[in-house]
Amino acid sequence: MIVSAIANGGTLMKPYMIDHVENVGGQTVKKFLPSAYGALMSANDAQFLTHLMSQVVEIGTGSAMRGASYTVTGKTGSAEFETGKETHSWFVGFAPADKPKVAICVLAEESGSGGAVAAPIARQVLDRYFAKYGQ
């Protein structure tokens, strides 16, 4: 949700799963609309974080996202959870970077670094999303 707030210029939105409900005849009987919890950060802070996350993709550990037909912001990471075990890897981000449509979070347990494991998984998901829905 934090990444989506960055994508929304600092506004934290309430998550929802259902766009609308239809009756048997296919008529919409209830429509769900996006609504905000409120400002999580200033628009300037969100813009600065977007820039930093874009740099992760352009020159940092988010290299799996480079060369996509869409722009991506992201942050990779790893989390230790038990001595002697492989770390959890993760990637969070949103795309397109300039007019976000989708936020993503990938967590791969006991798999290593975020740049090597989670980011390539996120790339596959985003590639399929944009192939189906366009930019």
PLM regions: where:
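Active-site beta-strand/loop architecture of penicillin-binding DD-peptidases
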Residues: 1-36, 44, 53-135
